[in-house]
């Protein structure tokens, strides 16, 4: 009703940007004739203006808004010259939304990557840095190489953060004007910086502005999982193994929904991902273990048993994890990608290792942690892009204070979303999907099937193999991950069938007829990389294009001489290329490689540099480099030959109706379903989508409840007969909304609890940073001492009693425990003084004693006292903060139980957590002052060794 009266608020928001777009389009006439030199000079001109107002954030904000039209016009022109891509008007609007610190919802294929160049250029002009955040290393690297060329052309430095980089490389890249990185690298670097022992180890500078690509994936899907840096803790692995054996013998209850007592040893709450032992279960577990109490504090077993049952019932192989190289590797439930190096905490990972019979890794203790919610709120200005944000608009606004604005598409969508079809059983559904794939494949239409787990993608693959239908599989299995970008590049070709696990955020567009540009780059890499990349340096390659081959003769730069690991060949699978190359194209490729070897030397470049040469050659940026010119000539010829085939295929595929997307199960989130749908019909292409569902699907089973069970009995139909029912569809959407609300509540709870930790984290990290930078360390230690003296006085003097009853002797002894240099202090010196006067007197005595201590230490080595101060403060902060994190975790678990006693667990957590924090700060102060006075380096030893 409001929309009818006031008009769509989104339309109003977009409308206010229209005059700016008109202004930019008018400026284009002035900027187009500029020479490259004059265009580049614009950056320096903008920077000069911004330097004058850098002291005032308000003035800087105002000036950036003033510069926006011209800066965007400059970026549009530079992009046209370097990449051959001109920003559409709607992309300009997207850039403005991002500059205003909002979320821009843009459909798949509308060029989000190009949009990000606009606000990142404008916000980097201040010299304070801009971060472009992506979901994985491959996308960060692709965007840094591809879009980075435009920024570099305009005189900005571009940095890239990748896994495995050294601290020096990281610092250099963070100091660039624009830095491309993944959310996890940024978060972990922040935590590591706050564990640094010396200021030189800190790699990040203060945050300024960030654009997050796939913002919903990072700020919502990953918000339930905090980033954790942990250290190892020794726990006996026999307990995990024994618990796993016991869990295997315990029986799951089958009558959990009825009013009767549960019949098994434990109940499983799939919705809450939890397990509960029944009374009989406790008795059986205790008997099997031969113990009298699972909760015995001297020999606790409950934690191990609960985790072992969770591993058995809730953590499924090839769905939640895969086993690779004798290790358990987690599979991300939203992207379907493996997450090597990530481990479940709290002993869960060990329980799964025990279940699978692989080596049990040591359990870990949290050293530092932060949630993505609180990490990204550290940025003064934050923005994001995604194809689907409107469904989570409320959460973005409440948690992050980010508005969502939908950017109009450049061309009208021609995608048809067909109604869902529902089958009675899961097997009936899969057979129908395989039949649909066969039919469409025979017609020549490309098909993309989205599955929710590795296991299901492999089951469908088996069904298609039985029917002899060629297809590509894209899931978390390592052999498939390696070819990810290749598979996506040809998913739009005539008759292609692609099965993908959770397609969201796959980063490469599906182009009808096939992606000639990407295939041409792949061909270039095949020739170029083996001859140019140094042998030590086939380090972290782009996921999806590295092939491994062991059988080539070593003389060709391949093979595995002396039994070493197989060398990378960069060889793509032969069936990806749409055509055989002409002799002319092959000659050009060989000539480019020969010139490269002659110029740089054979196998002499790092992989990053070699990749960068190809990326530059594949664009249009002017270059004087003869090697790039040769490579470009070869690339253009190869692309031309491939395009002759792909353009023809594209016309045929468009005629047939474009890409058809099949969803095989409704995801827990409507947004992920919409992302899958968005793969079809990009940039005005035709396309269609349909979801195939069954009454046995998880979502309906867990959240649909009894209504679905009744429906199942009501439908006395064959398993391969589709059911179309409005009630079913409504039931499904209701289930999805329920799940979304449920997960939103979990994220909200994670956020609220971490908010308590966040205030403490900020305080402790600020204190730590002050110490690292060495600012007034002596004054800080003396303040610690003065606070300690005050606390001793307050603890030993009761102001309600007459002064002759004060135990001054005890007070003086306590002071001497901390400051042994005050051994001459006597109780009678404090007689006749008020508590305040005693405090002032002790402050003076402390300062005298500290100066004396400093003189003693600096005789051994000048400046040693400052080093000792830094060392002891950092040591105490780190040790006690680590213990505090454990105490807060234990507190969080215990307050959860207080909800039963009508108390608000969050309020209890806040107040008790605050008390714990104050206790920790007191302990830090006391331990530091005690350590400083007890510090006694020996002159004959090398003094540094004492403190570093």
Swiss-Prot record:
Is Lyase given among the entry's keywords? Answer: no
Q: Which reaction does it catalyse?
A: ATP + H2O + cellular proteinSide 1 = ADP + phosphate + cellular proteinSide 2
Which Gene3D superfamilies does the entry mention? Helical scaffold and wing domains of SecA (1.10.3060.10), P-loop containing nucleotide triphosphate hydrolases (3.40.50.300), SecA, preprotein cross-linking domain (3.90.1440.10)
Cellular component, GO annotation: cell envelope Sec protein transport complex; cytosol; plasma membrane-derived thylakoid membrane
Q: What is its main location?
A: membrane
Highest taxon of the source? Bacteria
Location comes to: Cell inner membrane; Cellular thylakoid membrane; Cytoplasm
> Is Cytoplasm set as a keyword in this record?
yes
Q: Which Gene Ontology molecular function entries are recorded, alphabetically? A: ATP binding; protein-exporting ATPase activity
InterPro entries the record matches:
Helicase_ATP-bd (IPR014001), P-loop_NTPase (IPR027417), SecA (IPR000185), SecA_CS (IPR020937), SecA_DEAD (IPR011115), SecA_motor_DEAD (IPR014018), SecA_preprotein_X-link_dom (IPR011130), SecA_SF2_C (IPR044722)
Please state the Enzyme Commission number of this protein: 7.4.2.8
GO biological process assignments: intracellular protein transmembrane transport; protein import; protein targeting; protein transport by the Sec complex
* Enzyme class, UniProt record, top EC level: translocase
Quaternary structure note: Monomer and homodimer. Part of the essential Sec protein translocation apparatus which comprises SecA, SecYEG and auxiliary proteins SecDF. Other proteins may also be involved.
Query: Which HAMAP family does this entry report, sorted A to Z?
Result: SecA (MF_01382)
Q: Sum up the protein's function in the record's words.
A: Part of the Sec protein translocase complex. Interacts with the SecYEG preprotein conducting channel. Has a central role in coupling the hydrolysis of ATP to the transfer of proteins into and across the cell membrane, serving as an ATP-driven molecular motor driving the stepwise translocation of polypeptide chains across the membrane.
Q: Which PANTHER family match?
A: CHLOROPLAST PROTEIN-TRANSPORTING ATPASE, SECA INNER MEMBRANE COMPONENT OF SEC PROTEIN SECRETION SYSTEM
Q: What protein name does the entry list?
A: Protein translocase subunit SecA
The organism named in the record is Synechococcus elongatus (strain ATCC 33912 / PCC 7942 / FACHB-805) (Anacystis nidulans R2)
- Record lineage: Bacteria, Bacillati, Cyanobacteriota, Cyanophyceae, Synechococcales
């Amino acid at each position: 009703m409001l929309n009818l009266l006031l008009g769509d608020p989104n339309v109003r928001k977009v409308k206010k940007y229209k005059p700016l777009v008109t202004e930019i389009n008018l400026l284009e006439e002035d900027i187009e004739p500029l020479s490259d030199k004059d265009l580049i000079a614009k950056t320096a001109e903008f920077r000069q203006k911004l330097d004058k107002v850098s002291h005032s954030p308000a003035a800087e904000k105002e000036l950036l808004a003033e510069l926006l039209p011209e800066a965007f016009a400059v970026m549009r022109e530079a992009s046209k010259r370097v990449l051959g891509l001109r920003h559409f008007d709607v992309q300009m609007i997207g850039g403005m939304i991002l500059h205003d610190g909002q979320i821009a919802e843009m459909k798949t294929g509308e060029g989000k990557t190009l949009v990000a160049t606009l606000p990142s250029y404008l916000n980097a002009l201040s010299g304070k840095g801009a971060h472009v955040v992506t979901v994985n290393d491959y996308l960060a690297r692709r965007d840094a190489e591809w879009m980075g060329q435009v920024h570099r052309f305009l005189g900005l430095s571009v940095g890239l953060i990748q896994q495995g980089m050294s601290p020096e490389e990281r610092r250099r890249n963070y100091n660039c004007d624009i830095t491309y990185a993944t959310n996890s690298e940024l978060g972990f670097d922040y935590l590591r910086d706050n564990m640094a022992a010396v200021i030189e180890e800190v790699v990040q500078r203060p945050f300024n502005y960030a654009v997050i690509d796939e913002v919903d994936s990072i700020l919502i899907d990953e918000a339930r999982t905090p980033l954790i840096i942990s250290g190892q803790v020794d726990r006996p692995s026999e307990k995990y193994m024994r618990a796993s054996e016991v869990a295997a013998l315990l029986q799951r209850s089958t009558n959990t929904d009825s009013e009767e007592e549960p019949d098994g040893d434990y109940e499983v709450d799939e919705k809450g991902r939890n397990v509960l032992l029944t009374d009989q279960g406790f008795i059986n577990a205790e008997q099997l273990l031969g113990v009298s109490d699972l909760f015995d504090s001297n020999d606790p077993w409950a934690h191990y048993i609960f985790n072992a049952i969770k591993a058995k019932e809730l953590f499924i192989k090839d769905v939640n994890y895969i086993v690779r190289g004798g290790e358990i590797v987690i599979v991300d439930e939203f992207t379907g990608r493996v997450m090597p190096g990530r481990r479940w905490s709290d002993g869960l990972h060990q329980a799964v290792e025990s279940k699978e019979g692989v080596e049990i890794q040591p359990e870990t203790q949290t050293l530092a942690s932060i949630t993505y919610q609180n990490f990204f709120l550290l940025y003064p200005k934050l923005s994001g892009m995604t194809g689907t944000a409107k469904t989570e608009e409320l959460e973005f606004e409440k948690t992050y204070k980010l508005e969502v604005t939908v950017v109009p598409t450049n061309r009208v969508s021609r995608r048809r979303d067909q109604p869902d079809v529902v089958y009675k059983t899961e097997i009936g559904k899969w057979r129908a999907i395989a039949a649909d794939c066969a039919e469409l494949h025979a017609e020549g239409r490309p098909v993309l099937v989205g599955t929710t787990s590795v296991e299901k993608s492999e089951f469908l693959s088996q069904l298609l193999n039985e029917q002899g239908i060629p297809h590509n599989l894209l899931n978390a299995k390592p052999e498939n991950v390696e070819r990810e970008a290749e598979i996506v590049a040809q998913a739009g070709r005539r008759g292609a069938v692609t099965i993908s696990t959770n397609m969201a955020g796959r980063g490469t567009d599906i182009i009808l007829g096939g992606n000639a540009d990407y295939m041409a780059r792949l061909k270039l890499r095949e020739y170029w990389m083996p001859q140019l990349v140094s042998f030590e340096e086939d380090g972290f390659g782009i996921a999806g294009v590295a092939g491994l081959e062991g059988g080539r003769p070593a003389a060709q730069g391949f093979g595995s001489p002396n039994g070493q690991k197989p060398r990378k060949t960069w060889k793509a699978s032969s069936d990806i290329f749409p055509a055989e190359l002409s002799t002319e194209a092959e000659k050009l490729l060989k000539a480019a490689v020969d010139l490269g070897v002659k110029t740089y030397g054979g196998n002499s470049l790092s992989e990053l540099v070699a990749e960068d040469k190809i990326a530059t050659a594949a664009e249009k940026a002017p270059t004087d480099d003869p090697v790039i010119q040769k490579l470009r000539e070869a690339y253009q010829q190869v692309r031309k030959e491939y395009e002759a085939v792909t353009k023809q295929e594209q016309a045929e595929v468009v005629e047939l109706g474009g890409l058809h997307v099949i969803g095989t199960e409704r995801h827990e989130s409507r947004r992920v379903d919409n992302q899958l749908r968005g793969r079809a019909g990009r940039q005005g292409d035709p396309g269609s989508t349909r979801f195939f569902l069954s009454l046995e699907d998880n979502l309906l089973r867990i959240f649909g409840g009894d209504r679905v069970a009744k429906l199942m009995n009501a439908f006395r139909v064959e398993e391969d007969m589709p059911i179309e029912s409005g009630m079913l569809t409504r039931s499904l959407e209701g289930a999805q909304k329920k799940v979304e609300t449920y997960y939103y509540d979990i994220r909200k709870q994670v956020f609220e609890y971490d908010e308590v930790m966040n205030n403490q984290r900020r305080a402790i990290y600020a204190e730590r940073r002050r110490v690292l930078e060495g600012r007034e360390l002596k004054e800080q230690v003396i303040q610690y001492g003065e606070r300690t003296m005050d606390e001793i006085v307050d603890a030993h003097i009761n102001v309600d009693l007459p002064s002759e009853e004060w135990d001054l002797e005890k007070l003086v002894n306590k002071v001497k425990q901390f400051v042994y240099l005050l051994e001459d202090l006597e109780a009678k010196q404090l007689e006749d003084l008020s508590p305040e006067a005693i405090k002032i007197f002790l402050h003076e005595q402390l300062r005298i004693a500290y100066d004396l201590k400093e003189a003693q230490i600096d005789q051994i080595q000048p400046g040693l006292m400052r080093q000792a101060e830094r060392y002891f403060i950092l040591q105490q902060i780190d040790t006690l903060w680590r213990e505090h994190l454990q105490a807060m975790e234990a507190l969080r678990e215990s307050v959860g139980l207080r909800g039963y006693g009508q108390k608000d667990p969050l309020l209890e957590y806040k107040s008790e957590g605050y008390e714990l924090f104050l206790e920790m700060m007191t302990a830090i102060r006391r331990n530091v002052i005690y350590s400083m006075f007890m510090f006694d380096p020996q002159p004959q030893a090398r003094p540094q060794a004492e403190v570093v």
